[in-house]
Each structure stands twice: as C-alpha cells, then as structure tokens.
C-alpha cells in the first residue's frame, strides 16, 4: 500500500501530509523513493553518465549472514607396524596360502630347469652324432701319391663323451631336486614353528584371540 502511495505521490496524483511525514522519518521509504526516481529517470534517459551507488552496507550484511564453514578435521590413519602383521587375523589366514604358492613356484622352476636341461642335452646329442667330413689328400700334379688319411674320431671316444654328458646332466638334476626338497622342508618347519609360537602366545595372554584359536 505504501509503495502505491509513493508511486502516486511521485506522479503528482496525490498529496498526503501523513505520507510526507512518514517519508521524512522512515529510512526504508526513503530508499524506495530514491529507487522509484532512479527507475523513472532511467526510462526517460535523464540519468547522469556516472552513477554513485553505495552497496557496502548490503555487502557487509550479506557477508555476516553467510554461515561459517569450518574445515573438516583430518584423522590420520595409523598403518600397522611390520611386527604387528603376524598378529592380525587376516595375515594368519593368508599365510598358509602364501606358503603353498611359494612351494608351487619352486616346483615349477625346478620342472622348467629339468625340461630345459633335457632339451639342451638332446640338442648336443644330435650334434655329436653327425659324422665329420673325412679329409683326403689328393694326388699332386708331379711326384708320388701320398697315403689317404681320414679325420674321423674313434667310436670309443664319442661314447665316452656322451656318457660323461649324461652323467653330468643327471648330477645337475639330482642336485636341483635335493635343493628343492631341502628348501621345502625348511620352509615347512619354519611355518610350523611360527604357528606354534602364535598359539602359545594367545594361550598365555588372556583376552587375545586369533583366527586360528577362535571357535567357529
């Protein structure tokens, strides 16, 4: 209602002393009165080239109304120490699988070494079985004929060389198999010893349960 009265007063359609008195003492009505005059001058093209606006109070009020945003508190994550991994239930569950995978990997390496060694031995055997080309002494143009000589090695020497290669190959294979069996036994004994220590520690300290001692 007051805005309509201010618009009529600005257009000269009405003249009310009470409205003028209220306009003189009401800051909000004064701002509305200024806005109406600015709008009318802008529509008529009577505005000056430079307009002075004081919006600092409104900006300050808007800033004060903005909620205060507090940054979220970052909680540092504590990583378990290496000596604590063995006491974790997950590690106790994964450890037997890791041991089995290690044994399978060692067995695969030994099998691969045996296969490669056999193939290498077969290749050497085929090479040694090929006869060498005999060397003949031809008759010269002038003079006497020289005796014919053959550069073929004896069968006994070839057989001895093959037997030595076979024995060396077998010795290497036996050494690899013995080393694998020794490593497997040492790893199995170490795993059993660590599991026994873990179970003994869980029994001695009350209130601590691991995956191996917890009842299903």
UniProtKB/Swiss-Prot annotation:
Main location: membrane
Periplasmic side: 119-216
Transmembrane segments: 101-118
Statement: the UniProt record of this protein carries the keyword Membrane: yes
Stimuli inducing this protein: Transiently induced by cold shock in a PNPase-dependent fashion. Upon stress induction (OMPs or heat shock) decreases in under 3 minutes (at protein level). Part of the rseD-rpoE-rseA-rseB-rseC operon.
Effect in UniProt of substituting residue 172 to D: No binding to RseB
Coiled coil spans: 158-202
Key words of the record: Cell inner membrane, Cell membrane, Coiled coil, Membrane, Signal-anchor, Transcription, Transcription regulation, Transmembrane, Transmembrane helix
Region of interest (Disordered), ranges: 146-166
Similarity comment: Belongs to the RseA family.
Protein name, per record: Anti-sigma-E factor RseA
């Amino acid at each position: 209602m007051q805005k309509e009265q201010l618009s009529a007063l600005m257009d000269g359609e009405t003249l009310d002393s009470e409205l003028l008195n209220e306009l003189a003492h009401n800051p909000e009505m004064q701002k509305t009165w200024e806005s109406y005059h600015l709008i009318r001058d802008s529509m008529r093209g009577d505005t000056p080239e430079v307009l002075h606006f004081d919006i600092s109070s409104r900006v300050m009020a808007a800033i004060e109304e903005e909620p205060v945003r507090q940054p979220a508190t970052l909680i540092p994550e504590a990583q378990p120490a290496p000596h604590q991994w063995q006491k974790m239930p997950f590690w106790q569950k994964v450890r037997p699988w890791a041991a089995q995978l290690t044994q399978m990997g060692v067995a695969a390496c030994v099998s691969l070494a045996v296969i490669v060694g056999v193939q290498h031995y077969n290749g050497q055997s085929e090479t040694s079985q090929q006869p060498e080309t005999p060397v003949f002494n031809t008759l010269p143009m002038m003079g006497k004929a020289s005796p014919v000589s053959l550069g073929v090695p004896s069968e006994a020497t070839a057989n001895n060389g093959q037997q030595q290669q076979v024995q060396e190959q077998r010795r290497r294979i036996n050494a690899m198999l013995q080393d694998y069996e020794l490593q497997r036994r040492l790893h199995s004994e170490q795993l059993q010893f660590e599991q026994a220590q873990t179970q003994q520690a869980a029994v001695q300290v009350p209130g601590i349960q691991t995956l191996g001692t917890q009842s299903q």
